[in-house]
Amino acid sequence: MSRLERLTSLNVVAGSDLRRTSIIGTIGPKTNNPETLVALRKAGLNIVRMNFSHGSYEYHKSVIDNARKSEELYPGRPLAIALDTKGPEIRTGTTTNDVDYPIPPNHEMIFTTDDKYAKACDDKIMYVDYKNITKVISAGRIIYVDDGVLSFQVLEVVDDKTLKVKALNAGKICSHKGVNLPGTDVDLPALSEKDKEDLRFGVKNGVHMVFASFIRTANDVLTIREVLGEQGKDVKIIVKIENQQGVNNFDEILKVTDGVMVARGDLGIEIPAPEVLAVQKKLIAKSNLAGKPVICATQMLESMTYNPRPTRAEVSDVGNAILDGADCVMLSGETAKGNYPINAVTTMAETAVIAEQAIAYLPNYDDMRNCTPKPTSTTETVAASAVAAVFEQKAKAIIVLSTSGTTPRLVSKYRPNCPIILVTRCPRAARFSHLYRGVFPFVFEKEPVSDWTDDVEARINFGIEKAKEFGILKKGDTYVSIQGFKAGAGHSNTLQVSTV
């Protein structure tokens, strides 16, 4: 079916299909309890996000504990936990007595890196915590403060600690606000000492993935992997692309990362807002082609922080991110501090179902096969062939037996028009597979039996039963299965078409 035929035959009834796009929700004070987490999971939450820009270790440990408690209360599908790093941000200092100072247009003042002003800022002089700012910026350049609420033009680089600037609009100078230098290559380290401690905390407490903020180069990813160490070798690194450097170096970053987040908030400040649309589509397409999961984030249902219903533009934004190819969509303040967190997750889930119905799966599959460099690995060849078999046989599901989670990721790359049932003995693989579009993970807890054929049959039957529970398969339905010829990772080479 062509894309046009697909669109003209859309079934626009919400809830008429099973959602395949995963939902990430940031947990804050209003949602950090087991009962609310259960409600969020029932509404569609798959991955819990902890924002390490805020909160103590005690607080974040409570989020982890409550997430795990919610699984005891409501087993369902496994829940994944993500740690979002603060990252190498640039921020203003503290104003005197923590007062907000009004700034009129054309107001001239000083930006300084002199530490004596770090806690003594006012409307005449503002401390900035990036020591090299005078080396990387020049007269005429623009500096944004507080997510672009205030704009300043650099009038003069006075000395190695001082900039003279002019306000381009009215606003307020406040404490600890973010500073952006659009179009400027900054040389901040990939990780602050706080970030390193946060990563070690995450490894110790069993997080499944890291959302790495402000990634600029491939070396940044390698630095994070080094800090995670041997104990954290299975933690997935998802890079957040939120500046021009990250966009420019994306191809090299993509080679070494486990996944990508298009973080449109800071990205929309660093580059012209209209360009974010094209960058989003480009980064998602490149991630899809590489078989790496991609998340679309920031302000997706922002109005639902305070309103029970979204704007129509927000619904379209969520839907179009899914049509672009996003594996996951993310909520931030909507679930962290919003008045309607469960409504927000429900709205996102319902929107995802409708958007997925608008996808022309077969043309997408053909595009992916044609654009993927050859030869592919044995595992990817089997994965692509399984998806082809789904289209040929009109199969209702793909059952994947996997140890490492690689095979379901590659099946997801080719976007079958049916769910992917992952059966694994590895709880971690089950949890991080929520990153992959269409994967429904289940942990098979029985010990392996000595006869390999019997063990494979037991796991496939388990997958069939789980698919029946979710209404994916029924008696007489065709399904495709993928398994290996022996135990362990890297041996998926067998494809089978069967009937329930």
UniProtKB/Swiss-Prot annotation:
Its EC number is 2.7.1.40. This is Pyruvate kinase 1. The lineage of its organism: Eukaryota, Fungi, Dikarya, Ascomycota, Saccharomycotina. There is a cross-link at K119, K124, K161, K164, K166, K292, K394, K446 (Glycyl lysine isopeptide (Lys-Gly) (interchain with G-Cter in URM1)). Beta-D-fructose 1,6-bisphosphate binds at S402, T403, S404, G405, T406, T407, W452, R459, G484. There is a cross-link at K204, K255, K446 (Glycyl lysine isopeptide (Lys-Gly) (interchain with G-Cter in ubiquitin)). The record marks K240 as: Transition state stabilizer. It catalyses: pyruvate + ATP = phosphoenolpyruvate + ADP + H(+). The modification N-acetylserine is found at S2. It comes from Saccharomyces cerevisiae (strain ATCC 204508 / S288c). K(+) binds at N51, S53, D84, T85. Substrate binds at R49, K240, G265, D266, T298.
